[in-house]
Amino acid sequence: MQRWCGNWLPILLTVSTWACAAGSRPDPRVGRDLPGRTPAPVLTSSAGPWSFSPATGTRAYRISRNASIEEVTDSAVRRDAVSNFTHEILTLEQAGEEMSFRAVVDTFAVITQGAIEPAQIVALPIELTGSLGMAGVRMESPAPDSCDAVRATVATDIHNLLAPMPSQVSRGAVWRDVITTYGCQAGIPTTAVTRRLFTVAGEVEHSSRPLLLVQRVDSVDARGEGAYGQHRMKVEGTGTGTALYYLETASGEVSQLTTNQRTRITVTTSGRLHSFTQTTNQDFVRVR
């Protein structure tokens, strides 16, 4: 059963899917150290070009997510946090001119702090399928009008891991895309449109091997409306984010990925407006 904690709205019953859809305000420039993170990598002298040949087969990732939300009222500042991690297996196969994919989640764990409602038990495994082509990722599930927060989170992971990549790039190369993702906030279906800008920073030495560093900058607009108990709720959000991709230089596969995002959320219910600031970060690490 969902509950109200005073004026604290149940925004983060799970990690907000559309807040994790994109890659927060940390400066993405190479060479700047971020607090609490390892020093920024040093670019090699190579300027490319690098050519990619997409690889079929199976790879696995451990994905950790952290989100915090803050509401400032006249009387107090209220903060909550939630963390989760998943182990996801991603398989790619050639299907004509496109690639088909299957993502399987066999581990999903949630840790909450504060007034956030404990997450429901997740039935495992979770499987999503779809295809990857010139038009980007096409997801066969979840449906846009569904409200399965966990499956929507996994769908967002796929958009992060299977980001578009030109067949050949050089240092300084830039490209853009726009993706639409579907999430679930407190039982309210949400739709987010994310505009992403990719820039090739160059080759770096990472874990004693050369990888290609690609930076991403995002802007997000999200909307949702529906019933929460006896209340009509409207959710709106705008945010900005960054991401750092460490890619295999031969295949373009993701070896490691870090995303950060800061989102301003407004919730209207029963004629009252509530404002929140949400910060999220994700770390994707390939484990096989």
Where does each model-flagged region fall?
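C-terminal motif of bacterial Sec signal peptides marking the signal peptidase cleavage site
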Residues: 18-19
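Bacterial N-terminal signal peptides that target proteins for export
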Residues: 1-9
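Signature of exported/secreted
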Residues: 27-288
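Short, conserved catalytic or interaction motifs in soluble domains
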Residues: 22
